[in-house]
């Protein structure tokens, strides 16, 4: 299964890349393909990330939401978009 990772990034700028990378490793070890938006380059304007992230989400079968997802406007939008598309929603 292709799984897109989603969660609050801005609130944990120092650690989100490692947190996402750890989950990516865990899911890949279980045989999944992981679509990881934390691999995008740092430094773009915030309004530039979401169109890229939604395109990445298009390539996935499911979305994985980290525990903090409800505190992120981006993750809220990604969840709604995934549900609209009928993708499976997985919770951390």
Question: Model features per residue range: what roles?
Answer:
Residues 1-92:
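Conserved catalytic or regulatory cores that recognize and/or transform ribose-phosphate-containing ligands
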């Amino acid at each position: 299964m292709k799984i897109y990772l989603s969660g609050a990034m801005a609130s944990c700028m120092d650690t989100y890349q490692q947190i996402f990378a750890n989950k990516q490793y865990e899911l890949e070890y279980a045989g999944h393909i992981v679509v990881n938006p934390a691999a995008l380059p740092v430094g773009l304007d915030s309004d530039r990330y979401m169109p890229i992230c939604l395109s990445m989400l298009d390539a996935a079968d499911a979305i994985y939401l980290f525990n903090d997802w409800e505190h992120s406007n981006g993750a809220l939008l990604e969840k709604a978009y995934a549900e609209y598309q009928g993708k499976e929603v997985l919770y951390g």
